């Protein structure tokens, strides 16, 4: 399977500085350390293999070497920091669009930070703030299952890859460079409009929502909340109808599951 190419992933007209490494513990941890050492925003780090990749709640992100997209971006959006939580929502939308542009799939967004295809997780995102000597920065980590065919038993019913989702198409593999480049191009555009363009984007996020209308169980600050996902507000918060008839917005959650 072809290795990732930094020269192909780079787009000269955009401010990204793309690097590709063979193996690393975690691309997000590496960028956090780079930021603390004085690295400027715009660095994007792809890895063919991660030995300590992670998602929310420190869950490990496992992927076979050279098959998927595992990368992180070091960001400093020009908008006030109050708008930075929007980055994860915009990135999920970008991933959906990039997949749809390349493949005959209709990805959906599972609030707050996953992308689903055929009711299974195909991508996860994690944004973390880091305080540096030059001010606040953001590390956005993205894991996208592209060419993985086999998953561990504990994930086989809940995870998928793009290649698995488009079978029986004849390709032996999907082009990771093309998909990664498309994500970087669209992500730059969306982040540049994080302040004034978000309300337009959130309408599409609603249309792509996997959760809306479902009964869910969310873990928020260690406690469980049950309810029906009604809507997303203009900031991308989940509006939940509770069993007692009250309505509550959730700005984040450690875990969200559908209640069958």
For every predicted segment, state its role.
Residues 3, 13-14, 79, 85-107, ...:
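Long, positively charged amphipathic alpha-helical accessory segments at protein N-termini or as interdomain linkers
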Residues 1-101, 173, 260:
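N-terminal lobe of the biotin/lipoate ligase/transferase fold
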Residues 114:
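Conserved active-site carboxylates
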């Amino acid at each position: 399977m072809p290795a990732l190419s930094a020269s192909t992933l780079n787009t000269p007209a955009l401010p990204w500085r793309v690097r590709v490494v063979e193996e690393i513990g975690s691309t997000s941890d590496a960028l956090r350390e780079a930021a603390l050492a004085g690295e400027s925003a715009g660095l994007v780090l792809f890895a063919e293999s991660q030995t300590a990749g992670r998602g929310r709640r420190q869950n490990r992100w496992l992927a076979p070497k050279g098959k998927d997209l595992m990368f992180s971006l070091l960001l400093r959006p020009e908008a006030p920091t109050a708008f930075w939580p929007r980055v994860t929502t915009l990135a999920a939308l970008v991933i959906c669009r990039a997949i749809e542009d390349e493949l005959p799939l209709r990805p959906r967004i599972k609030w707050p930070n996953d992308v689903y295809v055929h009711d299974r997780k195909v991508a996860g995102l994690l944004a973390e703030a880091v305080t540096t000597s030059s001010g606040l920065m953001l590390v956005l980590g993205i894991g996208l299952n592209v060419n993985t065919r086999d998953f561990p038993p504990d994930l086989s019913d809940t995870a998928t890859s793009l290649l698995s989702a488009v079978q029986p198409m004849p390709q032996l593999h999907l082009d990771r460079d093309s998909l990664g480049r498309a994500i970087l191009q669209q992500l730059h555009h969306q982040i540049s409009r994080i302040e004034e363009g978000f309300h337009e984007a959130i309408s599409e996020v609603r249309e792509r929502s996997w959760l809306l209308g479902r009964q869910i169980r969310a873990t928020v600050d260690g406690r469980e909340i049950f309810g029906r996902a009604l809507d997303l507000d203009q900031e991308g918060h989940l509006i939940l109808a509770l069993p007692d008839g009250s309505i509550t917005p959730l700005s984040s959650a450690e875990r969200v599951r559908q209640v069958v």
